[in-house]
């Protein structure tokens, strides 16, 4: 039986048209479609279970705002995890990854960063990766980030990405390394009749 509920804020960042909205749509609805560019921000949510913990992933898609070279800080304020996307076949989209990683670490130093290469299906069909794997690894090491490659078209690694984000967060919370981003109200013990606030995952 689930004993604990946690709200986990996730933000998606990246160059225009790398497929951020497609990732969210694939994950939350299981569907794929070539979507139009989102202006401003869009919000979606989905519940996952990690052990005895129920995690509500609140997913903020910041599509469109990257046109101004700076995302409004309010989008990722108090975020627990950030998915920084780039198109595996597009070098220009990769050049923005460092920009977003710097923005995040300066404004939310406790945030966990996931560098996600999109459109993996194109690579599997014969396209060439625009960024050498070692360069991606070096950038990930610099920001202590995780690396994923996904395809919204086939769904490959999309669910795994979000499940890993939830699991990593619960591990950090249990270890005391990221106490719900200094916001204990994110965690609610639902094992008693009166819902009592608590500071970590069970």
Curated annotation (Swiss-Prot):
- Where would you find this protein in the cell? Endoplasmic reticulum-Golgi intermediate compartment; Endosome; Endoplasmic reticulum; Golgi apparatus
Q: What GO terms fall under cellular component here? A: autophagosome; endocytic vesicle; endomembrane system; endoplasmic reticulum; endoplasmic reticulum-Golgi intermediate compartment; endosome; Golgi apparatus; membrane
Motif segment (Effector region): 35-43
Signal peptide range in chain numbering = none
* Membrane topology summary: Lipid-anchor
**Does the keyword field hold Manganese?**
no
Q: Extract one GO BP annotation from the record.
A: autophagy
What does the record list as coiled-coil region(s)? Answer: none
- Residues binding GTP are 14-21, 61-65, 118-121
- Kindly give the Pfam families that the UniProt entry links to this protein: Ras
Asked if the record carries the keyword Zinc, the reply is no
Molecular function GO labels: GTP binding; GTPase activity
* Residues linked to a lipid group, S-geranylgeranyl cysteine type: 201-202
Q: Which InterPro entries match?
A: P-loop_NTPase, Rab24, Small_GTP-bd, Small_GTPase
Keywords, in A-Z order: Autophagy, Endoplasmic reticulum, Endosome, Golgi apparatus, GTP-binding, Lipoprotein, Membrane, Nucleotide-binding, Prenylation, Protein transport, Transport
- Family listed: Belongs to the small GTPase superfamily. Rab family.
Function field: May be involved in autophagy-related processes.
Q: Which PANTHER family match?
A: PTHR47978
Name the UniProt record assigns to this protein: Ras-related protein Rab-24
Q: What is the lineage of its organism?
A: Eukaryota, Amoebozoa, Evosea, Eumycetozoa, Dictyostelia
């Amino acid at each position: 039986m689930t004993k604990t509920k946690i709200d986990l804020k996730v933000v998606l960042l990246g160059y225009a048209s790398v497929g951020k909205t497609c990732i969210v749509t694939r994950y939350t609805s299981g569907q794929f479609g070539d979507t139009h560019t989102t202006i401003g921000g869009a919000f979606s949510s989905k519940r996952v279970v990690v052990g005895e913990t129920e995690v509500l992933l609140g997913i903020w898609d910041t599509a469109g705002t990257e046109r101004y070279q700076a995302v409004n800080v309010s989008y990722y304020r108090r975020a627990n995890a950030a998915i920084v996307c780039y198109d595996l076949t597009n070098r220009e989209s990769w050049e923005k990854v460092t920009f977003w990683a710097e923005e995040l670490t300066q404004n939310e130093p406790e945030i966990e960063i996931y560098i996600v290469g999109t459109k993996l299906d194109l690579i599997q069909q014969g396209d060439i990766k625009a960024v050498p794997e070692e360069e991606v690894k070096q950038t990930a090491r610099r920001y202590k980030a995780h690396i994923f490659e996904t395809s919204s078209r086939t769904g490959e690694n999309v669910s795994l990405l979000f499940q890993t984000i939830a699991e990593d967060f619960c591990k950090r919370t249990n270890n005391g390394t990221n106490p719900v981003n200094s916001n204990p109200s994110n965690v609610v013990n639902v094992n008693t009749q009166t819902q009592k606030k608590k500071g970590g995952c069970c």
